[in-house]
Design a protein with these regions (language model features):
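Membrane-interface helix termini and inter-helical loops of multi-pass transporters
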Residues: 2-4, 81-93, 158-160, 222
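Hydrophobic alpha-helical membrane-embedded segments
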Residues: 6-38, 110
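Hydrophobic, aromatic-rich alpha-helical transmembrane segments
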Residues: 7, 11, 15, 19, ...
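Alpha-helical transmembrane segments and their membrane-interface exit regions
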Residues: 24-25, 44-49, 171-179
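Selected alpha-helical membrane-embedding segments in polytopic membrane proteins
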Residues: 32-123
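Hydrophobic alpha-helical transmembrane segments and adjacent short intramembrane/lumenal linkers
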Residues: 128-210
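Juxtamembrane boundary at the C-terminal end of a transmembrane helix
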Residues: 209-223
């Protein structure tokens, strides 16, 4: 339960990471004010999902920046957690945050590719596009919210196991809301096929991680 001591080496990457995240938020707010205003109220109403989920069948810069922000936020959360528990051997000390960021981006991009591949196998392209849009919206919102809490914790010297548990809870709860939104949006269609719908969700959400873990094991065993 001891708080982290804010050594210079610890803050070397934390400050630029916060600066980048808040800079991306400012960019979205300045260049997409209507978009951003609707996104801010994501947990209050589903206006953002209802309007932009249909409009943005193709990649939109707002969604791309959100996704990038999510990657940086998650990397920062992992970085702080690893520093707190003294985990240093997996990455070089000097470039630990950069390596984590690249790893998170690679994993999430691979996950997207695998989800698209799984959706094409089951002929679920339309559903998968809606699914991915909602998941990105909520998971990015969760990551940004967790980083805002982390910002207060880091610069108040309050980073502890309790705070890390709170951050994990924020990620878990808001991501769970995305599943509620997906089910609500497809309730009429899934009622007669609830079992198959659960299988589809498992295929889209769990299958990518199975492939990633299997691939990682192959790489490790061949080294």
């Amino acid at each position: 339960m001891e708080p982290i001591t804010l050594h210079h080496s610890y803050l070397t990457w934390v400050f630029p990471a916060f600066l980048l995240i808040f800079g991306l938020v400012a960019f979205l707010r300045a260049f997409y004010p209507k978009h951003f205003a609707d996104y801010e109220r994501l947990l209050v109403n589903n206006k953002y999902i209802a309007i932009y989920g249909k409009k943005e069948r193709k990649l939109h810069l707002f969604t791309v920046v959100l996704y990038l922000m999510q990657c940086v936020c998650l990397a920062l959360l992992i970085y702080v957690g690893m520093k707190h528990f003294g985990i240093k051997k997996l990455f070089s000390e000097r470039f630990m945050f950069l390596e984590l960021t690249l790893m998170v981006i690679a994993i999430l991009m691979l996950k997207l590719v695998i989800q698209q591949w799984v959706s094409s196998l089951f002929d679920l392209s339309d559903f998968c596009n809606d699914y991915i849009f909602i998941r990105i919206a909520y998971s990015s919102y969760a990551a940004i919210g967790a980083v805002l809490v982390l910002f207060i914790g880091v610069y108040s010297s309050l980073v502890s196991v309790t705070l890390l548990a709170v951050l994990f809870s924020i990620l878990l709860i808001i991501n769970a809301l995305s599943w509620v939104e997906i089910i609500k949006n497809n309730l009429k269609e899934i009622k007669p096929y609830i079992f198959y719908f659960i299988l589809y969700l498992c295929a889209l959400e769990i299958a990518p991680y199975v492939f990633l873990i299997y691939g990682a094991r192959l790489v490790i065993t061949h080294q």
